[in-house]
Structures are given as C-alpha cells and as structure tokens.
Regions:
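N-terminal targeting signals for export/organelle localization
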Residues: 1-97, 233-239
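Extracytoplasmic
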Residues: 61-63, 108, 116-118, 148
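Short, ordered coil/turn segments that flank beta-strands lining enzyme active or ligand-binding pockets
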Residues: 71, 106, 203
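Sequence contexts marking disulfide-bonded cysteines in secreted/extracellular proteins
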Residues: 79-106, 110-117, 134
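Conserved redox-active cysteine motifs that mediate thiol-disulfide chemistry
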Residues: 117, 125-142
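Thiol/disulfide oxidoreductase modules built on the thioredoxin-like
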Residues: 118, 167-175, 182-232
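Hydrophobic beta-strand anchors of alpha/beta hydrolase catalytic cores
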Residues: 122-123, 153, 198
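Conserved segment of the thioredoxin-like fold in thiol-based oxidoreductases
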Residues: 135-182
Length: 239
C-alpha cells in the first residue's frame, strides 16, 4: 500500500524518501518469508492427494492395506498397496493389472500391515530429506522399547536408498521394524506430506488419529498412552 506520496506531513523530510524505505523493508520481509517457506519445504514431500489420511473426521475408517519390503533383509520390489475389497472400499485401489492383495502376499522379507492389527498400531512415515526425521525416529525407537508389549510399531522410509536406510538403522541402533516405500506409492496412498507423519490406529487396523512434525518423548509417549486408553474404551463399547 502507498501512503499519500508527495504530501507534507510537517516533519520537514522529503516524503518521497519514505516509500523507498518501506519498499526496502517489504522486500526484506518478503525474502525472509520465502526463506521460511524453503526451509519448511525440506520437511515435506509431494503427494497426489491433498491432506493427510484422517486429518478430517474419517469415522471408523480402516487403514489402507499394504505390504512393504523389510529394510533389514534387503527384499526386492516396491510396496504392494493392492486392497482386497476394491469394489466396495472407500480406500482407492491401484489402477492397472490386478495384483495380489497386500495382506495375502507370501513373500520372504515382506512386512504386512495386517499382521500388526492384533494390537493398537503406530506407523511412522519418514525420509532423510526431513531435517528432524532421523531424531524423530530415535523418539519412535524409545517408544517402541517402552510400549512394544502393548502396541505394534512400524516405520516406513519413503524413497531413500536401501543402503542409506540400513546405515541409519545400524548407526542409531534401531530395533523397531522398518519397511521401505521405494517408489512413494504407499506414502501417496496415505497422503503423507510432512516428516515425520505418525498414524495411530485401533486394534483391527481402524484409524484413530495422525500427527505431523516434531514431538518430544513426553509428547509422543502421551499420544501412545492415549491410543492405548482409547483402544480399551473402544473395545468395551464396540461389539
């Protein structure tokens, strides 16, 4: 906005100088804002769908089924995201040739999410391009050590090389399960846009909540505790 250039306000200064200083200030602020956007972009990935899975009220929505290669075994192939109920499910199925549903695959070294539905479940989608993602996986590991008898945990790396992921597993001494989403198809299905993205689910693979971004140990543990409590309450009321 311009402020009446050419009018004397009694200050004795040439009014034509003030718009120039305002313009310079606006330019500096604008450049700082662009820098912030660029920094934020480091912790995001591009997906074809807007919004994180469950960010709005999804109701009793089942998690999309998937099977991923185990990062520790070096199993080949991409994530399998074929569903077993394509005709009736609210979750989209991949186009193209018919594939074996993810939870029916029998491939050595594959991690099937359906095998984790016997307990509450926490998924972590992460990638090395995110500034805090590696540290957040350390938080995820500590939660795994604390809650693994009550809750299942699975981390899914998005589009990093197998060797890089295995190197990080060894360096950080992670013992929680880690799967690979080599081509990003799974992260797109789950509408992952930030790093890390945590997905929380009730037993049976029913969506409960998501959280995006950095969490302290206390914050993350509180969310897992809340999932456990909500799962018990749900089990007592849902038949």
């Amino acid at each position: 906005m311009e402020n009446g250039a050419g009018r004397d306000d009694g200050s004795g200064k040439d009014p034509s100088e003030r718009p120039r200083r305002t313009t310079i200030y606006s330019l500096i602020v604008g450049m700082a804002f662009i820098a912030l956007i660029a920094i934020a972009g480091i912790n995001t990935i591009s997906t074809q769908n807007k919004g994180v899975l469950g960010a709005s009220n999804e109701g009793d929505m089942p998690l999309a089924q998937f099977a991923v290669p185990n990062a520790r075994t070096g199993a080949g192939g991409d994530a399998n995201i074929a569903q077993d109920d394509c005709d009736s499910a609210r979750i989209p199925c991949p186009s193209g040739n018919q594939r074996t549903p993810a939870c029916r695959v029998d491939v050595p070294g594959a991690i099937r999410v359906c095998d984790l539905f016997d307990k509450p479940l926490v998924l972590s989608f992460w990638f090395t391009r995110g500034g805090d993602c590696e540290n957040q996986e350390d938080v995820f590991q500590r939660a795994y050590r604390r809650f693994s008898r009550q809750v299942n945990f699975l981390a899914v790396d998005v589009r990093d090389s197998d060797s890089e992921v295995r190197k990080l597993i060894a360096e950080h001494h992670w013992t929680h399960p880690v799967g690979l989403d080599r081509d990003g198809a799974l992260s797109n299905l789950y509408r992952v846009g930030g790093c890390p993205t945590f997905v929380y689910a009730y037993p049976g693979g029913i969506f409960q909540a998501t959280s995006i971004g950095k969490l302290s140990d206390q914050q993350f543990f509180s969310k897992v505790d809340a999932l456990i409590a909500a799962s018990k309450q749900r089990a007592a009321t849902v038949r």
